[in-house]
């Protein structure tokens, strides 16, 4: 959906350059800390892109590095059904499908501070993958 990117930028989202991970990480952390200092909540898709197959893939470290540097907790949210509503390469929403949202318990500031970023990403991924599996069983 090529119109989503420009719409998100107008909304105040943080665009990243996919070809330069180091620059992207610095931008996420700097801009993210600025928004957090203004009282905003930030939503980050930790895979770095939307899943084209509806499965959970490896998490990148940006969200976790930001939480660690900003000293804030992480509230994991699992989404199921996005690939049915926002089909890849389509310009239209498919409103006839269900999007399930499951909010998980927050990850404490203390746990974030004492856990290495890559380990934290793996832990949160495991918790979210298990929750996604449970949502799909219902």
What are these regions (language model features)?
Residues 1-22:
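Catalytic core of membrane glycerolipid acyltransferases/transacylases, capturing the structured
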Residues 26-138:
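Non-catalytic C-terminal accessory region of glycerolipid acyltransferases
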């Amino acid at each position: 959906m090529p119109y989503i990117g420009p719409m998100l930028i107008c909304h105040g989202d943080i665009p990243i350059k996919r070809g330069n991970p180091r620059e992207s990480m610095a931008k996420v952390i700097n801009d993210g800390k600025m928004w957090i200092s203004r009282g905003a909540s930030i939503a980050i898709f930790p895979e770095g892109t939307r899943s084209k197959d509806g499965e959970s893939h490896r998490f990148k470290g940006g969200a976790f590095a930001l939480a660690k540097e900003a000293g804030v907790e992480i509230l994991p949210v699992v989404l199921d059904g996005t690939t049915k509503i926002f089909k890849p390469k389509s310009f239209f929403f498919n409103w006839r499908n269900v999007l399930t949202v499951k909010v998980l318990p927050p990850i404490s500031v203390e746990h974030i501070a004492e856990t290495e970023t890559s380990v934290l990403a793996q832990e949160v991924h495991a918790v979210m993958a298990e929750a996604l599996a449970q949502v799909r069983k219902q």
